[in-house]
A protein has these predicted regions:
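Short pre-catalytic strand/loop immediately N-terminal to key active-site residues, enriched for Gly-Thr
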Residues: 138-151
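Charged C-terminal helix
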Residues: 172-193
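Phosphate-handling active-site elements
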Residues: 138-139, 164-178
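Short beta-strands and strand-loop turn motifs
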Residues: 19-22, 47-54, 80-89, 117-118, ...
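Conserved phosphate/ATP/ADP-binding segment of small-molecule kinases
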Residues: 62-137
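Conserved N-terminal subdomain of the carbohydrate kinase-like
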Residues: 1-55, 60
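Short, small-residue alpha-helix embedded
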Residues: 87-88, 148-171
Length: 193
C-alpha cells in the first residue's frame, strides 16, 4: 500500500542514514516513493537488489516495475540481480558467461555504477558463479555449490554489501567480503524440514 509506505518513510525523516539497501518494491507506486527517498538522501551508499521474480506478479506488473527500477540505477552504488532478474532487466535470455557479461554491460549503460549478477549454479554445475562489472573490468567470483535448502541469500548478500560500503570498503571489496560471508552463513546454517 503506497499510503502506508509513505507514512513509514515519513516516520524515518529524523533518522540519519549512513547507507540504504533496497529490496522488494511490490509495485510502481511504492518504487516511485522509494526513488524520491533515495534522491533526497544523495551521497550515501545505495544498494539495489532488484527483486522482480515473484509468483504473485503478472507480466504487465513486472514490465512496469522493471522500467521503474531502472530509474534507480544512476542513484545506486551497485545493483545485485540474480540471473532471472538480470534477464528481465536486460530483456535477454542469459545462458552463457558471455551472455551474463553482455547483460552486465547493458545494465551499466543504463546508469548502474556497478553490477553483480548472481548466476548461482545455472552457469556451471560445479560452481556458483557471480559476475561483477564496474564499467571498466569484469571480475568472476566463484564458490563451491552448497547443496542445501535456504532462502534469503540474495537479500543477505545485498545487505552485507551495504554494510561493507558503510565501513569504507570499495564496491568490489564489499562484494568479495559479502560473497564469502553469505557462503559461510549457508555452509554453517542449520537445516530443518
Amino acid at each position: 500500500d503506497p499510503t502506508t509506505f509513505a507514512q513509514q518513510l515519513n516516520s524515518l525523516k529524523d533518522v540519519p542514514f549512513s547507507a540504504i539497501k533496497l529490496g522488494l518494491l511490490p509495485n510502481v507506486e511504492v518504487a516511485d516513493l522509494a526513488l524520491a527517498y533515495v534522491k533526497a538522501h544523495a551521497g550515501i551508499p545505495v544498494v539495489l537488489d532488484p527483486v522482480l521474480v515473484c509468483k504473485e506478479t503478472h507480466d504487465v506488473e513486472v514490465s512496469a516495475l522493471r522500467d521503474e527500477l531502472i530509474k534507480f540505477f544512476p542513484y545506486t552504488n551497485i545493483i545485485t540481480p540474480n540471473l532471472p532478474e538480470a534477464e528481465l532487466l536486460a530483456q535477454k535470455e542469459l545462458r552463457t558467461l558471455e551472455d551474463v557479461k553482455e547483460a552486465a554491460r547493458h545494465l551499466h549503460s543504463l546508469g548502474a555504477k556497478s553490477v553483480v549478477i548472481k548466476g548461482g549454479n545455472r552457469l556451471d554445475t560445479q560452481k556458483a558463479i557471480d559476475v561483477y562489472y564496474d564499467g571498466e573490468q569484469f571480475q568472476i567470483l566463484e564458490s563451491p555449490i552448497l547443496e542445501n535448502n535456504n532462502t534469503g541469500a540474495g537479500c543477505t548478500f545485498a545487505s552485507s554489501i551495504a554494510s561493507q560500503l558503510l565501513l569504507g570498503k570499495s564496491t568490489f571489496e564489499a562484494v568479495q567480503i559479502s560473497k564469502k560471508f553469505v557462503y559461510q552463513a549457508i555452509q554453517h546454517s542449520d537445516q530443518y524440514g
